């Protein structure tokens, strides 16, 4: 059941992406928008259009989600501008995917929806009911799942598959983490405001962007300024709706100019000068520092002692039969049944004779679906049925410990970190080039 660790390019994060980009709203919300502007064309994207109805659906959903999260909702014009820009980028990518012959069949979509339901501890019909209760028609949610899968395949083809990481880069990365200051290295949580100005743009356009960025910098430096609100309303980055929050980043994953700029800042301070990056200008605020969480900065890894019960599909059992049997077994275990005895009796894995015990597992030694589920469990907790390429599993975590990582494991972690950083930058560059080479006309006046 274990597998060899291998480098995989950055995944698209389907669950988060679906939640973020699903454009559907309830019929009641649609009626509230009014019919007069519903079918007005708000943007032309090559040979396609985006209508006012589509834009209002997306804006309404995002606004409601922000309200549910008790997060500030940007002014309507600003939110519409940001959402319309996201929709334009999405539409351009869908067109490119179709031109490339990328298709996603129904079986793949259904399997993905099943995994989403499983990740939420539900069966598919329960998950469907939950989505619809949130005001999102199921057929549109399925359509968005198909679109996200298509864009993920497009990114893999056009960007991720072309990312390479040399042994020299790995060695350099590890050396930087093992340097004299490695023990005291800190991760940085940053917020930023981005103003687009590609290096190959006309100088006049760069000057205009710089002037705008300088004005925003002065606002950010002003006493009492709300950096998060300013980022939500003015940043041209995709993370603007999150207030420009980049989360915690290791210094090795950030541009050196950014690391140098924030090195002298105290938490809460804004860097007093603009930072020129290849595609624009950055205004950066240091939110906080913490001890490095980067696995490559430490020889320690976390191992998990785990056992499981595996039921294979196709050996006299259908998908639903295997899943239901494990649900019944889990219920008995939670009522005091012996996991080990159930594993010896029912598991179809080679570990059955050991009561399902897989021993101590290091990161990357199991298939991703198994590892993700395992990592969410507390000691002693038993998972819901988890689907992998092998069948359905019940997983129980018995304990965790810190262990010395092998040289190969450290190299794998470093290679993954470098690959992720390079893939994100390459994707950003590719997306910008795709946007610049497309015909886009905004028909509805929106704030910029």
UniProtKB/Swiss-Prot annotation:
It is found in: Periplasm. This is Chaperone SurA. It catalyses: [protein]-peptidylproline (omega=180) = [protein]-peptidylproline (omega=0). GO terms for cellular component: outer membrane-bounded periplasmic space. It comes from Burkholderia pseudomallei (strain 1710b). The PPIase activity resides only in the second parvulin domain. The N-terminal region and the C-terminal tail are necessary and sufficient for the chaperone activity of SurA. The PPIase activity is dispensable for SurA to function as a chaperone. The N-terminal region and the C-terminal tail are also required for porin recognition. The gene is surA. Residues 185-288, 301-399 form the PpiC domain. Keywords: Chaperone, Isomerase, Periplasm, Repeat, Rotamase, Signal. Residues 1-27 form the signal peptide. PROSITE patterns: PPIC_PPIASE_2. The keyword Repeat applies. Chaperone involved in the correct folding and assembly of outer membrane proteins. Recognizes specific patterns of aromatic residues and the orientation of their side chains, which are found more frequently in integral outer membrane proteins. May act in both early periplasmic and late outer membrane-associated steps of protein maturation. Pfam families: Rotamase, Rotamase_3, SurA_N. One of its GO terms (molecular function) is unfolded protein binding. It comes from the Bacteria. InterPro entries: OMP_Chaperone_SurA (IPR050280), PPIase_dom_sf (IPR046357), PPIase_PpiC (IPR000297), PPIase_SurA (IPR023034), SurA_N (IPR015391), Trigger_fact/SurA_dom_sf (IPR027304). One of its GO terms (biological process) is Gram-negative-bacterium-type cell outer membrane assembly. Its EC number is 5.2.1.8.
